Amino acid sequence: DVFNAVMQKADTTMLSEETAIGSYKLEAVEAMRDITTEAELSLEYGHPDYESSNISERDKEKKYLIRSALRLAEDLDIEHILLFTKTGRLARFAAAYRPSHMIHAFTGNIQTLRYTNILFGINPHLLPNW
């Protein structure tokens, strides 16, 4: 199940309730980590242009901006991308492209920080008073 979730490019995996309360939860998490690490080695992450017909014009602009930034980072061999987001929407658009670069998402909102923490390839940071 873990391997298939990685192959389907899930943003996150987690233990089921039975496993989370069982006697071997630490071992289960370690096994999930190992399976995920191995499975990710066989994936190729590109920048597919996902469906944009159901989003606003402003969000389309954000999506295109993120796509351009990811392609530019790839062309220039840039390892880290910084983005600033109040709602997490920009980070969600970035995660949808399954980036191969580390994306640091800065926010002043604790709920946004928690939300972006489970997104694929996003490393969230809290900026108090922003």
Label for each model-derived stretch:
Residues 13-15, 80-83, 93, 104-105:
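Structured core elements
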Residues 2-25:
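Glycine-rich phosphate-binding active-site loops on the catalytic face of alpha/beta enzymes
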Residues 16-17, 22, 41-51, 79:
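Flexible, glycine/charged-enriched surface loops at secondary-structure junctions
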